[in-house]
Amino acid sequence: FLPSREYHSAEDVQAAVDEMREFFQTGATMPLHYRRGILVKLRSYLKKHEKEALQALTDDLGKSSFEGYATELGIVYDEIRFCLSKMYGWAKPKRVPTPLAHFPSSSKIYASPYGVAAVLSPWNYPLQLALVPMIDALTAGNCVVLKPSRTSQSTSAFLQKLCEEVFDERLVRCLPGSSEMNDWILSIHFDKIFFTGSPTIGRQIMHAAAENLTDVTLELGGKSPCIIASDANIKRAAQRVAWGKCINSGQTCVAPDY
């Protein structure tokens, strides 16, 4: 697979983001039937290329097809199904109380998308943690720049192919590459940044986002104690602790630490 477009500088990335922002400002992503169509098309593509996706996970991480489906692809399908079932309700205006000083007016909250969002995903769940936040952003009506991890090269190549074959490039772009690509992305003003990874990189992203007061969601892992009550079934508890620690070779943010 050869990408249709290459990015050699921050200026190239900026030009791409500018095109996406112009597309967003046309209002093309606002109709719910448009968003629904995107999710249905993505699901159909994944179903058709399921073996390819699972093989990429095997190539990168040694995951069996069962584990790849259970911990990644199946979760992506669940997210698509959930968003399809809830998106119309989420989009409805929500009536809220109005202060007496504003009588006789009424108040509502209208949900609106941010604009162009950046999703920076990690290598340990390279499919799930790239597609799930992207699906959520698209459901809300955003455009998305996806930056997958350079460590999971096979999955990143699959994601780039998926993005080019499923989406209008003004809606979604996949920008794989080195840490230099991360620097280029962080030098640009996005309307939302979603990052999963280490606290060290998370601090850099928060610092860069502060320059533009960009809204940020950081999932940085942490410590995960496992508490076993005195009246627990010890055998069953031990099995579950071992499963939680060993699944994905222990590379899970909530794997039991102690």
Predicted regions and their residues:
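Short beta->alpha connector loops at strand-helix junctions that form conserved
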Residues: 142, 147-149, 176, 196-197, ...
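Active-site phosphate-binding strand-loop segment of PLP-dependent enzymes
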Residues: 168-206
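Residue-level signal for inorganic ion chemistry
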Residues: 35, 80, 141, 172, ...
